Design a protein with these regions (language model features):
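Catalytic domains of riboflavin
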Residues: 2-240
Length: 240
């Protein structure tokens, strides 16, 4: 029975059988989109994430499919923004983008995160296929509150590396296990990674992902983020 044919009325309101039927029908519709895209919707042994939902996502860069993934151990939710058919693709353009609440949402000028995200989406939309994986790894893995604490230290003269280490964190606390699992669930065979960060390439290769090449992400600097970008080059090995 379709969703339109399942109208709630006084008889079925609160009926557990009806509720279960409605939930199953909704799940069937949700996973139909995932299956149409060819993504892996099965639980994989040893994986920390699973594919939970897919839907179309129109943006100013073009129309994508947004795939949502749930990480069971900590309830984090990650997403993949997919353009075109990526199943079985080799040399698939892909960016792994760590969440930046201040930059991506509030358009902060302290970093170049939003500019890189938009550049990646624009690039991928111009190609036959591609993906942006958006990970809940705020502040290079230290979380939003600690990131804002690090901002305060930067206001006092610390650079982005020293601010993190003064708070007791490594300069970069991210890992790429979840990203590698998402790439496998999207059934991508190899990737061309959009990044200026060699550690991302190394991290993904360590998790078994084939990275065929690096695609530089070229964005402009501002007076606000110039020191931040230079520190990433000088102290974290970022490339241009």
């Amino acid at each position: 029975m379709g969703m339109k044919g399942m109208k709630k009325n006084e008889e079925n309101t609160g009926n557990p059988d009806f509720s279960a039927q409605l939930e199953q029908t909704a799940n069937d519709y949700i996973f139909k989109k995932c299956l149409e895209c060819g993504f892996d919707v099965e639980w994989r042994e040893g994986f920390s994430v699973h594919l939970a939902a897919c839907a179309e996502l129109p943006t100013r860069f073009g129309t994508f499919v947004i795939a949502a993934f749930s990480e069971e151990s900590n309830q984090k939710e990650h997403t993949a923004i997919v353009h075109g058919s990526v199943v079985g693709e080799q040399d698939c353009p892909l960016r792994v983008h760590s969440q930046c609440h201040t930059g991506d949402v509030f358009n902060s000028l302290r970093c170049d995160c939003r500019s890189q995200l938009e550049a990646a989406l624009e690039y991928i939309a111009s190609r036959p296929c591609g993906v942006v994986i958006y990970l809940k790894q705020e502040g290079r893995g230290i979380g939003l509150i600690n990131k804002i604490r690090a901002y305060h230290l930067q206001d006092m003269g610390f650079d982005t590396v020293d601010a993190n280490t003064c708070l007791g964190f490594p300069e970069d606390a991210r890992d790429y296990r979840v990203a590698s699992e998402i790439i496998q669930l999207l059934r991508i065979r190899s990737i061309a990674l959009l990044t200026n960060n060699p550690r991302k390439i190394k991290g993904l290769k360590k998790e078994g992902i084939t990275v065929t090449r690096r695609i530089p992400v070229l964005v402009g600097e501002t007076s606000f983020n110039k020191k931040y970008i230079q520190t990433k080059r000088d102290r974290m090995g970022h490339l241009e």
